[in-house]
């Protein structure tokens, strides 16, 4: 059935300034908040198996759209100096900063925390969103001594620690902010009515200066399914290993 849920909020602002001495600058900011019930880029059979769900895959909950950065800032500047009618030098800079260099603990632009195994009994493993326990009494572990490690894992993660006592959202997690700076020097040379160009491009220039800059952090795949379904107890409750 068609659904009337879902939303897409996009805000963009841009400033441009051209100076008379050959300098052009631009600064732009974009904010995106998009939610849907289905990851629309998949065919039906693949979508049923791969989309993280909170229970019934036939009635998917509203969740964050998989693609697109939540926030993005870009800035550019170019300067041109004309040495003569046939020779000029152009220096350009492109800077990008974004949140959500994109991950449902399962991959894509956003991430979701999912169980290892088929918890909801739909015949597909690895697509069930986890419940984030607040205490040891809210989860059955094969080894009860693993609670201390699981509790510490939850505490160190910004998303998990904030959503204790809840089922994780589909695509609820984002990668950390990242920055990137690219530089280009372009030399234009005119000889005998012909124009030649020689360019020097330095990608991720910040990382050339400091190896801690210009690094994009992504989720560790091993951490995307922290809980694995081991068995079911006599009460029909799932038992997990961590």
Residue ranges and their predicted role:
Residues 1-242:
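Short, solvent-exposed micro-motifs at the edges of structured domains
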């Amino acid at each position: 059935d068609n659904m009337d849920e879902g939303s897409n909020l996009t805000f963009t602002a841009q400033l441009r300034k051209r100076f008379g001495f050959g300098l052009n600058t631009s600064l732009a900011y974009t904010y995106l908040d998009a939610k849907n019930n289905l990851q629309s880029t998949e065919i039906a059979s693949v979508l049923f198996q791969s989309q993280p769900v909170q229970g019934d895959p036939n009635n998917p909950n509203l969740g964050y759209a998989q693609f697109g950065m939540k926030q993005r800032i870009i800035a550019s500047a170019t300067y041109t100096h004309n040495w003569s009618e046939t020779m000029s030098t152009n220096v350009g800079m492109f800077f990008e900063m974004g949140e959500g260099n994109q991950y449902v603990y399962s991959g894509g632009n956003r991430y979701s925390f999912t169980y290892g195994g088929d918890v909801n009994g739909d015949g597909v493993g690895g697509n069930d969103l986890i419940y984030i326990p607040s205490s040891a009494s809210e989860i059955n572990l094969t080894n009860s001594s693993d609670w201390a490690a699981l509790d510490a894992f939850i505490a160190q993660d910004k998303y998990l620690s904030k959503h204790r006592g809840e089922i994780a959202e589909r695509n609820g997690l984002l990668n950390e902010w990242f920055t990137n700076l690219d530089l280009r020097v372009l030399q234009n040379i005119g000889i005998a009515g012909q124009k030649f160009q020689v360019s020097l491009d330095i990608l991720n220039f910040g990382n050339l200066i400091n190896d801690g800059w210009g690094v994009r952090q992504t989720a560790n795949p091993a951490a995307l399914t922290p809980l694995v379904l081991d068995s079911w107890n006599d009460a029909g409750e799932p038992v997990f290993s961590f």
